[in-house]
Regions:
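Soluble extracytoplasmic regions of secretory-pathway and membrane proteins
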Residues: 6-531
Length: 531
């Protein structure tokens, strides 16, 4: 009886700690089940009158306890439990083998559906919404911002979540605060966590968002208010991984857990539904994939999507072709990023041949809420080649480029990226031609970068924040502002400004000359050309 009670307590404790789903298609549960069958088999293989531990003498009169193997004998019950464990594990291994890519190559290739288009169909880029900063930079900005708030940093730290979302059409990374240590949790858990950090991925501005109702459920909670444990208790049979922290359009905090079902036995997991947990009160609701609220951004995780896109590129012509001849075998490039398009967030990565050469065959965009995947065919340089080209343009500064993002400016494919110093902060920006990647433009701001590109290529960039202007220069003057030479002049009595970096013509500009360009709301000319 004692052994039965011990095993029941042991099962409950290990389940509460490791939280495997009660689902036979989950390897977590299979290991959990087989492990406990082995433990029970060993326990019931000891004679009832045998102490499981025995005292042994060590040197110098010291004693220690060790397992009493002398009392171990495999009776029918103990041996049967061990046999059942072995059978279950063997069957799971057999099913796993049968559902592997060796036998199911076509099924692996068809796990995702990819629509192919030409680059002319690639969404036009709104440069005011391109997330130039990368995750590590956002983390540094957010952590430093919290460190400046002395009343918060003594009790809380920033979680390492930093989920990228699209909020009101703009890209942000958000992360909740978490208790600095168990003592801080004990002192503050009754009132909860009242703030989260929000970092603008375009400007780099950080803010601490105050919540009307504090979060009582988070990853830094203990016991039943831990997010994953709370969900597991309410949904014991569902397969899900670590839920993502998200906020809705009103800034309310939630945790979003994608529920998976295995394709063909123990094969590839695919999303089947979504569970949303209100972080303020613990209320949950499960949605089918076609009912997911529009504010939810991350239903299809990036790493799994990329893996399954690679299945498609690898196995579309069969297992042996992928292994030997590799004809038409493709794979995603190393690294990925995110784009905000409309109110959704899209996964972006390149596609190259299996030979992993220096050129891309195209680009992938995946709507992370709906799972729709589109491949845009375009022969171009890989992201790593573009990064190397950008870093080479400023090699004297030893800057490191962030992972590039493909943008469509006037139907031209370009990589845009930040250039970071040794401290991990973005100091300059680079624009690299995706086809002729030796063509690089570098500037201190994104606006200057785009202005340089427009002037160099005699283009008018599509941007709602600028308007065309032309006229005759009058009252020309110049001044140095924050290290930049700025030219001032009047047109019809109105003062306009333009930085020297915008055009090589500016040092030679004279009163009475005609010009044309584009001006922003701040009266700075974004492009400038002498007529």
């Amino acid at each position: 009886m004692k052994r039965i009670i011990f095993e029941i307590v042991f099962i409950a404790t290990t389940w509460y700690i490791f939280l495997p789903p009660f689902n036979l298609t989950s390897w977590e549960f299979i290991f959990f089940l087989c492990g406990h069958l082995v433990v029970m088999g060993i326990l019931f293989s000891f004679r009832k009158d045998t102490n499981l531990l025995k005292t042994v003498h060590v040197r110098h009169g010291k004693v220690a306890n060790e397992l009493n193997l002398e009392g171990l004998h495999f009776n029918k019950l103990g041996g049967g439990l061990l046999l059942v464990s072995g059978i279950i594990f063997a069957l799971a291994g057999l099913v796993s083998l049968v559902t592997s890519s060796f036998f199911q190559a076509k099924n692996y290739a068809n796990v995702v559906s990819i629509t192919e288009k030409d680059f002319k169909d690639f969404p036009k880029s709104d440069t005011s919404k391109v997330p130039i900063l990368d995750r590590s930079t956002a983390e540094k900005i957010g952590d430093r911002y919290l460190g400046s708030l002395t009343d918060k940093v003594s009790q809380y730290v920033a979680a390492d979540t930093y989920t990228q979302l699209t909020v009101d059409g703009k890209p942000y990374r958000v992360t909740p605060l978490e208790y600095a240590d168990p003592i801080k949790w004990f002192n503050n858990q009754s009132k909860g966590i009242g703030e989260y950090i929000k970092v603008d991925m375009v400007t780099g501005n950080a803010e601490l968002v105050d919540l009307k109702t504090p979060m009582k459920y988070s990853d830094s909670e203990y016991f039943n208010r831990d997010v994953k444990r709370h969900l597991r208790i309410k949904y014991p049979t569902k397969i899900f991984k670590t839920p993502s922290f998200e906020v809705d359009d009103e800034g309310n905090p939630f945790y979003v857990a994608t529920v998976y079902q295995k394709r063909f036995g123990l094969g590839v997991p695919r999303p089947s539904s979504v569970i949303i947990l209100d972080a303020t009160n613990g209320e949950t609701k499960e949605y089918s994939l076609d009912e997911v609220p529009e504010w939810v951004d991350r239903v299809y995780p990036a790493e799994e999507t990329i893996e399954q896109i690679n299945y498609n590129g690898k196995y579309k012509d069969g297992f042996w072709n992928a292994l030997i001849s590799k004809k038409n075998v493709t794979q995603t490039t190393e690294g990925y990023n995110y784009l905000s398009i409309g109110n959704d967030i899209y996964l972006y990565t390149g596609v190259t041949s299996a030979n992993a050469d220096e050129s891309n065959l195209g680009f992938i965009l995946e709507n992370m809420r709906t799972g729709e995947i589109t491949k845009y065919n375009l022969a171009s340089a890989t992201e790593e080649s573009a990064r190397a080209s950008a870093e080479g343009a400023v090699q004297e500064k030893a800057y490191k480029a962030t992972f590039p993002i493909l943008v469509n400016l006037n139907d031209k494919p370009l990589y845009i990226m930040g250039l970071k110093d040794n401290a991990g902060l973005v100091k300059e920006y680079a624009l690299v031609d995706a086809v002729e990647y030796q063509n690089v433009i570098v500037a201190a701001t994104v606006d200057e970068l785009l202005s340089k590109y427009a002037n160099k290529n005699d283009l008018e960039l599509d941007n709602e924040t600028v308007e065309n202007i032309k006229g005759v220069v009058a009252d020309l003057k110049s001044a140095v502002i924050k290290g930049d030479t700025v030219y001032f002049f009047k047109v019809d009595g109105k003062i306009y400004k333009v930085k020297a970096s915008v055009s090589d013509d500016l040092p030679y500009l004279e009163n009475g000359q005609s010009f044309e360009g584009q001006v922003g709301k701040d009266n700075y000319l974004k492009t400038f050309k002498v007529k």
